[in-house]
Amino acid sequence: MGIRFLQAYTPGTRNRSVSDFSELTDKNSTPEKALTVSLHRAKGRNNRGIITCRHRGGGHKRLYRQIDFRRDKIGVTAKVVRIEYDPNRNARIALLRYEDGEKRYIIHPRGLNIGDIIQSDLNAPILIGNSLPLRNIPLGAEVHNVEFQPGSGGQLARSAGAMVEILAKEGNFVTIRLPSKEIRLVSKNCWATVGQVGNIEAYNLTIGKAGRTRWLGKRPTVRGSVMNPVDHPHGGGEGRAPIGRSRPVTPWGRPALGQLTRKPKKYSNTLIVKKRKK
């Protein structure tokens, strides 16, 4: 992937950068129709139309591409047909055609090219795009799309540039380092895909203007200190007044900005060797 920096023709293009989409097979191609479904987004509302999650709404209409996170066609090889853009994630997706004719989408790993042959197998070779259990992947290998529980489908390291490093194997568990630098244990029977997720420069893009964020379906975030007291606990006062409390709180009065939100006795605490860096 490359980044294209726009000239300051208008205030909206000043300091703005976009992807050049050079890794895509065809910039004007349409997605595989059998693998797409309509996407109804709730825009942060519940069944009564009341806002339950703020700062959501609008955005461009999208089709959802059904991604194969399980990689459960064991022993059947597949050929990479094309690499496509997916508006629902910052990673690219790759269209596979299996030997039996079935087509599926997967997250595109960095270095996977059109025409490559990949597979999912218990003893698949350690090649980019192949999927196999963690117990059969050597130490130090970089993987993505890692399962939390055997058979649950990949849940870890699916965004652009993400990868998980295998550190150790002991008993029924494998020690891994997550993108957040958290070190934790997962079952050795969990499956993962070899390689790092592509589009590694996605986080170097500069949005450039507010409207581009609205295209993504994100609405503005208003500070509580500029609201009225009826709208937020931080609101009110004369001029630029402080929040007037011993600590920051949410619009509903719960502690915020530094308050730990993870349950202290959560069952998975015993599997975390080292907490993530904040």
Swiss-Prot record:
One of its GO terms (biological process) is mitochondrial translation. Its main location: plastid. Transmembrane segments: none annotated. Coiled coil: none annotated. GO terms for molecular function: RNA binding; rRNA binding; structural constituent of ribosome; transferase activity. It comes from the Eukaryota. Residues 222-269 are annotated as: Disordered. It holds the Pfam family Ribosomal_L2. Belongs to the universal ribosomal protein uL2 family. Part of the 50S ribosomal subunit. This is Large ribosomal subunit protein uL2c. It comes from Chlamydomonas reinhardtii (Chlamydomonas smithii).
